[in-house]
Amino acid sequence: MSTAPSQQHASAQVPDPRGRFGDFGGRFVPETLTRALDELSEEYEKAKRDPEFQRELDGLLKTFVGRPSPLYHAKRLSSAVGGAQIWLKREDLNHTGAHKINNTIGQALLTLRMGKTRVIAETGAGQHGVASATACAHFGLPCTVYMGAEDIRRQKPNVFSMKLLGANISAVESGSRTLRDAVNEAMRDWMSSVEDTHYIIGSVIGPHPFPMMVRDFQSVIGRETREQCRDTFGRLPDCVVACVGGGSNAAGMFYPFVEDEGVRMVGVEAGGRSATPGDHASPLSYGNPGVLHGSYSYVMQDEDGQTCDVHSMSAGLDYPGVGPEHSYWKDTKRVDYIDCRDDEALTAFERLASSEGILAALETSHAVAKAIEIAGKMSDQEHLVICLSGRGDKDSMEIARLRGEEW
């Protein structure tokens, strides 16, 4: 299989029927999961054509999630930066405090359509775990969330919220005890329970149809942003910025703009402590194509093809792979991918808090940091939108620890 960058232009008409985004994506799974994935693909295609499914989903997004989320003009930050007008797409104001609920509500509805009676999920920062537990509580479905032991330490508020919502938390002690290991354990569970269980994957990763399906559920972010920009300042933005771990908030924001060539899109990965392998989580910046969790995409791996350990202070970006559509956008040069160090993200967290009164998630703060740099090189007649993917309440204790302060 070729790993050379594609020369084609990025298209919104992906994936193909095999789940391929150019060279990327596909389905690399044991035979055990093939039937479950075929069933999911078939049911999702039926749901997309079912007006009643869309009406129910739209109704829940409005009355339960609280959509549309606002597009907020960060005037003080814009003035201080002295460049482009900075706008925040406020996904942090959704029910549960992040974009993750857009996807879990959709997949929970599919769970019911398929007649499944149990849900499993993985989580890193805990936001997908909370969103999964919330959706399951709403629909009366039992939920087990797999979470790395290190992430449980970093994200105690979200762990407690999941328990209050009735979810069973399964701590993963293997490997680096982070998101990658949580996905591994969730996959193992699913292989032994496919008859009655649906796995709500939380990002645009995994085997087909998950990358497409999660992107579609999250694309409400970009669709609203397009409409809000036109209503607010009369045209599309000049630049859109989002953080990228697995990449669901970025995919949801970017996808509706893919064919708008005048809109620059920038994805920001976790640069961690340094560019040294093991010190960051930036597969699009430093990785190579390979297979991880059932999909072919850019991955942090060694010369033998073994997945490398990665690092980010933000649990939600601490992942060695990325969604295949992001790999496709990278190789077609439709999206620019850059990385942001831990210290830069922490500074941006503090700057947004003090200038706008908004506590952004540490994941989101990576996007804020680089958006500030980009905006500073633009004119004050231009407009830049940041996908503010989640709120930072969950990170309070970890930020206190990073700053050496008592909690």
UniProtKB/Swiss-Prot annotation:
Gene Ontology biological-process entries: L-tryptophan biosynthetic process
Keywords: Amino-acid biosynthesis, Aromatic amino acid biosynthesis, Lyase, Pyridoxal phosphate, Tryptophan biosynthesis
Pathway, per record: Amino-acid biosynthesis; L-tryptophan biosynthesis; L-tryptophan from chorismate: step 5/5
Catalytic activity, EC: 4.2.1.20
Obligatory cofactor(s): pyridoxal 5'-phosphate
GO cellular component: cytoplasm
Top-level taxon of the source organism: Bacteria
Region (Disordered): 1-25
InterPro entries reported for this sequence: Trp_synth_b_CS (IPR006653), Trp_synth_beta (IPR006654), Trp_synth_beta/beta-like (IPR023026), TrpB-like_PALP (IPR001926), TrpB-like_PALP_sf (IPR036052)
Catalytic activity: (1S,2R)-1-C-(indol-3-yl)glycerol 3-phosphate + L-serine = D-glyceraldehyde 3-phosphate + L-tryptophan + H2O
Modified residues (N6-(pyridoxal phosphate)lysine): K100
GO molecular function, one term: tryptophan synthase activity
Biased composition (Polar residues): 1-11
Similarity comment: Belongs to the TrpB family.
Alphabetized PANTHER family for the sequence: TRYPTOPHAN SYNTHASE, TRYPTOPHAN SYNTHASE-RELATED
Self-association state and partner proteins as the record states: Tetramer of two alpha and two beta chains.
Role noted for this protein: The beta subunit is responsible for the synthesis of L-tryptophan from indole and L-serine.
Protein name in the entry: Tryptophan synthase beta chain
Native species: Rhodopirellula baltica (strain DSM 10527 / NCIMB 13988 / SH1)
Organismal lineage: Bacteria, Pseudomonadati, Planctomycetota, Planctomycetia, Pirellulales
